[in-house]
A protein has these predicted regions:
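STAS-like cytosolic regulatory interaction modules
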Residues: 1-103
Length: 103
């Protein structure tokens, strides 16, 4: 599944990198997603990834998030409800990352 509206931005806020993704994250763009996460994580011992505007996330994206969580303190911003929030629970990402919900 590919969405032409996939966008990725990285910035530093309060000494910690923040990566914001929108649209679908899947095999077509997970390379860019993973590279951005790795570069951001190299800048700090913690990283925040805002997934609140992500509409779809496949297992390759989950794997990229687990890879970052293995070496860096990871915080994820997600909608209060929906498929991305459900995916965090099913995959176990909610046990290795701090999850912040947004309405």
């Amino acid at each position: 599944m590919t969405n032409s509206q996939f966008r990725l931005t990285a910035a530093v806020a309060e000494q910690s990198p923040v990566v914001t993704a929108t649209g679908d994250i899947d095999l077509a763009n997970v390379g860019e997603f993973g590279d951005t996460l790795t570069k951001a994580a190299a800048q700090s011992d913690s990283i925040t990834v805002d997934l609140s505007e992500v509409s779809y996330c496949d297992s390759t994206a989950v794997r990229a998030l687990f890879a970052v969580a293995a070496t860096t303190k990871l915080a994820l911003i997600v909608p209060a409800e929906g498929p991305i929030t459900t995916l965090l629970g099913i995959s176990g990402l909610d046990r290795v990352a701090t999850v912040v919900t947004r309405n």
